[in-house]
């Protein structure tokens, strides 16, 4: 698309970044300066009754700056990138029709990619192939399956954690069905996003600062009642670690603790480590992202001014 054609499209703003980088705070402050409406781009915030462990904005914050696509599903339900794209496009159209600017904020980079580039023509799921993969995983473990993916599709293996059997299984399944890797197929995108998108990524300049923030926030969640929240979910007896909701960082480790597999201190240690690993994967995505303006989360005023300057130009 030419610059002239792009300039004629309605504007949209992406605020992306790793967990605990200050994305939400920036987005909420921007609402005071620009005619924006917020859309959450977070695969954990979609779930009801999962508030503390997902660092969901508080009721007061949501009253001040409402977020769309938060609290839309029960934790038993799944939600794909295709589901997100459909819902986000609907919300963006609604916001644009009201004469305001969609501001999409979050850290689920797969959702941003699906929205920006469209969905790729991936083969449908094949139950027989998936069963063979799961049977092999039971024999050799998901770590070994991840090494297998590293040989087949190293790019996908970097982005998919060995402890994410759903995405790992899907990447292998795509290859076994089509003979093409997930990375190859996702280069063939569908419909591009019909908006002039201003893309920003926010993170501390030093990785150590992000690690400190992550550890501090995990302890704040625990102090705020994360264990009580997780116990209520655990007591439902209809949730388990094969579900995307319970695989969210923090909840998976809390589940192991509540199941008696690990003690409290180990749960805290693993929870912090898993969150740091998530942030590392998010940063890997962002470093390969095109046309993104980087913001320093340690200078929030400067970050705010930069976004306003770019969007208002």
Curated annotation (Swiss-Prot):
Top-level taxon of the source organism: Bacteria
GO molecular function, one term: ATP binding
Positions of substrate binding: 19-24
Cofactor(s) needed by this chain: Mg(2+)
Keywords: ATP-binding, Magnesium, Nucleotide-binding, Transferase, tRNA processing
E.C. number: 2.5.1.75
Protein name: tRNA dimethylallyltransferase
């Amino acid at each position: 698309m030419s610059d002239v054609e792009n300039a004629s499209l309605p504007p949209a703003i992406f605020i992306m970044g790793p967990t605990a980088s200050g994305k939400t705070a920036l987005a909420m402050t921007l609402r005071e300066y620009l005619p924006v409406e917020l859309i959450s781009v977070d695969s954990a915030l979609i779930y009801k009754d999962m508030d503390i462990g997902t660092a969901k904005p508080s009721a007061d914050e949501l009253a001040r700056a409402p977020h769309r696509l938060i609290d839309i599903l029960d934790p038993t339900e799944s939600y794909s990138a295709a589901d997100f794209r459909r819902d986000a496009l609907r919300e963006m159209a609604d916001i644009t029709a009201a004469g305001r600017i969609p501001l999409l904020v979050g850290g689920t980079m797969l959702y941003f990619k699906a929205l920006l580039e469209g969905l790729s023509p991936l083969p449908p799921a094949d139950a027989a192939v998936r069963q063979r993969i799961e049977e092999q995983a039971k024999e050799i473990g998901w770590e070994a399956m991840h090494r297998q993916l590293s040989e087949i599709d190293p790019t996908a293996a970097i982005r998919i954690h060995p402890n994410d059997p759903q995405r790992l299984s899907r990447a292998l399944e795509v290859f076994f069905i089509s003979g093409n890797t997930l990375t190859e197929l996702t280069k063939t995108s569908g419909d591009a996003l019909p908006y002039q998108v201003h893309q920003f990524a926010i993170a501390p300049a030093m990785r150590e600062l992000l690690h400190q923030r992550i550890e501090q926030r995990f302890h704040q969640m625990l102090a705020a009642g994360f264990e009580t929240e997780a116990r209520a979910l655990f007591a439902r007896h209809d949730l388990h670690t094969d579900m995307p909701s319970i695989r969210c960082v923090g909840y998976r480790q809390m589940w192991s603790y509540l199941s008696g597999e690990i003690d409290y201190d180990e749960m805290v240690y693993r929870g912090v480590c898993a969150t740091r690993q998530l942030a590392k994967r998010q940063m890997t995505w962002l470093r390969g992202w095109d046309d993104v303006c980087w913001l320093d989360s340690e200078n929030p005023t400067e970050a705010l001014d930069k976004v306003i300057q770019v969007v208002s130009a």
